[in-house]
Each structure stands twice: as structure tokens, then as C-alpha cells.
């Protein structure tokens, strides 16, 4: 299984266009040891030729340009993206579909809740129906059964409902429904390598922990270091848990969760611009290093 990190930042990217927190200011003027990142998205493949896009970042055009395998140029217009899987209906995970309209029709796999949000509140499905057949919805069931996607037939996917938050525009924002957010457990039938992918993760219970323990590689929510980070940095008024993101530090935080699982690789993704782990010289980054936890970066490649 090939895993390509196309984008590793949370919504807004890093640096965020209107943000002057320590990290954003520092990456612009060189005073912070950090590298810019685009908004979160990954690509998966079973053969390195056909790819499944997991979430469609607003930065998808730049991400494709940075990864030539997605544009193999075999014909006048071409793409190696054979399918798209949406793990939620967040703006920063779906807006990229607009930039992919020239390649319609696209096979888009998502839950019924996500399809509802993208048909009504943020109506990408009806909007893009005017471009060569638009988006063809392929429903993801929440029955715990593995499913295959024809673009990469040697991969098996299992959708895992997560406790997180629907986007602000969704009628489910304050009324969570199963399927608003999912994680993916992905298995390669040839190598037996396994991935657990959950860029938006608000709570971890014992059932979810069991899925995480089965994975060779964890690619999980790295949004915030501390739950009150947005308030402390004076860039927001919500706690991480109110936004559906489990902070890394503190009792029950992601660091404690990851210490309970044996995965060979533990990687944080969807990292907010305020998070001190973006600074490679920070004490927080040193704590991750000491714990064997990696920080995803744009262009990172993992093979299982």
C-alpha cells in the first residue's frame, strides 16, 4: 500500500493567510524552524499507478502539481485519480471537488450524512452535475463490513464512525449523527499492511482503540497541542473538543492514546497553524520525538 501525504495542515493551511500567530509569523520571516503545509488530504494506491484521493483539499491543484504520479499525462487530458473518498463534509476536505470539475464524472464514496450535507447545505453534488455527469455517489455503509473500490482492488476499506463534529453549516453541527465523520481502516490484501486514518477525531473509546491496535500505521488527528490553544493564541473562541478535535496533551489526550497502541508508525496529520509541534525546535516537538510520534509533512510517502 502506497500512502502519499498531499497536505498535512488543518483548515487554512500553514501559514494561514490572515493569521499572525507565532508560528505563522515565524514561518513567513524565518524565525521559526517550520515548513509550510497545505490543507489535509492523502492519496492511497495498491500499485503506485491508480490512486484513491481521501478528502479533496482546497489546495488540490497545487498538491497534484507536487505529485506527478497523479497526472501521468498518457493522453491529452489525464488523471490517475480513480476514486475519491470523503471522511466528512468539512469545507477543507470537500472544496477541492470544485477544482476537479474538469475531470468529471468522479466516483465519490461517502456516508449518507456527508452526501446529505453536500446536497443541501453545501450543494456540491447538484452543482457539479452540470459538468459531464458530475459526482457519482457511492454510499459508504456503517455496518463494519469491509468494502472494495474498483480503482484499487487490492485494498479493503472499513468505515468506522467517529465521535467528532459536523461542519458549522451542517444541520447536524450541534446534533451529531453516525456518519458525520468516519475513520478508515485500510488493508492491503497482498502485503497485509494496515492503516488507520482519522484526521478528525474528537474522542477515543475502547471500541475505537481496538481498531487502532490492529493498524501497522496510524495517521490521526494532530490539530491542537492543547485543548484551549485557540483561546490562548487569541485566534478563536472554541476549545478543541468543541470543534471535534482531541488535543495531544493533557489527561486522555492523543499522546496518552497513542501510548496504548503498538503501531510501528504513529503519525499526526491535520495540524493547525497554532500547534507548537510545527516548530521543529520546540519542546513539544521534542516530546513527540521522544515518544516515537511523527509529524506528517506535505510529500511524505509511507509504504506498507
Curated annotation (Swiss-Prot):
An individual GO BP term: pyrroloquinoline quinone biosynthetic process
Keyword Translocase in annotation: no
Disulfide pairings: none
Keywords: PQQ biosynthesis, Transport
Transmembrane segments annotated in the record for this chain: none
Protein's organism: Pseudomonas aeruginosa (strain UCBPP-PA14)
UniProt protein name: Coenzyme PQQ synthesis protein B
Keyword Transport: yes
Stated family: Belongs to the PqqB family.
Function: May be involved in the transport of PQQ or its precursor to the periplasm.
Signal peptide region: none
SUPFAM superfamilies: Metallo-hydrolase/oxidoreductase
Pathway annotation: Cofactor biosynthesis; pyrroloquinoline quinone biosynthesis
Annotated InterPro entries: Metallo-B-lactamas, PQQ_synth_PqqB, RibonucZ/Hydroxyglut_hydro
Xref: NCBIfam families: PQQ_syn_pqqB (TIGR02108)
Amino acid at each position: 500500500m502506497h500512502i502519499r501525504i498531499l497536505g498535512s495542515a488543518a483548515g487554512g493551511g500553514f501559514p494561514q493567510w490572515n493569521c499572525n500567530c507565532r508560528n505563522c509569523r515565524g514561518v513567513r520571516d524565518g524565525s521559526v524552524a517550520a515548513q509550510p503545509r497545505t490543507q489535509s488530504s492523502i492519496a492511497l494506491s495498491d500499485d503506485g499507478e491508480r490512486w484513491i484521493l481521501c478528502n479533496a483539499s482546497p489546495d488540490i491543484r497545487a498538491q497534484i502539481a507536487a505529485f506527478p504520479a497523479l497526472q501521468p499525462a498518457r493522453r491529452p487530458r489525464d488523471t490517475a485519480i480513480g476514486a475519491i473518498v470523503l471522511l466528512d463534509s468539512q469545507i477543507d476536505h470537500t472544496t477541492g471537488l470544485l477544482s476537479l470539475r474538469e475531470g468529471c464524472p468522479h466516483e465519490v464514496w461517502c456516508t449518507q450524512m456527508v452526501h446529505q450535507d453536500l446536497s443541501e447545505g453545501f450543494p456540491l453534488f447538484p452543482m457539479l452535475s452540470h459538468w459531464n455527469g458530475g459526482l457519482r455517489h457511492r454510499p459508504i455503509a456503517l455496518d463494519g463490513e469491509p468494502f472494495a473500490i474498483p480503482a484499487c482492488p487490492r485494498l479493503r476499506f472499513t468505515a468506522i464512525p467517529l465521535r467528532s463534529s459536523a461542519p458549522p453549516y451542517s444541520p447536524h453541527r450541534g446534533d451529531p449523527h453516525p456518519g458525520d465523520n468516519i475513520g478508515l481502516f485500510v488493508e492491503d490484501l497482498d502485503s497485509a499492511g494496515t492503516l488507520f486514518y482519522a484526521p478528525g477525531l474528537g474522542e477515543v473509546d475502547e471500541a475505537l482503540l481496538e481498531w487502532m491496535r490492529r493498524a501497522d500505521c496510524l495517521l490521526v488527528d494532530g490539530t491542537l497541542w492543547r485543548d484551549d490553544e485557540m483561546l490562548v493564541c487569541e485566534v478563536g473562541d472554541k476549545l478543541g473538543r468543541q470543534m471535534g478535535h482531541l488535543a495531544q496533551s493533557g489527561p486522555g489526550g492523543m499522546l496518552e492514546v497513542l501510548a496504548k497502541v503498538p503501531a510501528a508508525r504513529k503519525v499526526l496529520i491535520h495540524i493547525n497553524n497554532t500547534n507548537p509541534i510545527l516548530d521543529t525546535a520546540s519542546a513539544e516537538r521534542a516530546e513527540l520525538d521522544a515518544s516515537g510520534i511523527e509529524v506528517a509533512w506535505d510529500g511524505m510517502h509511507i509504504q506498507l
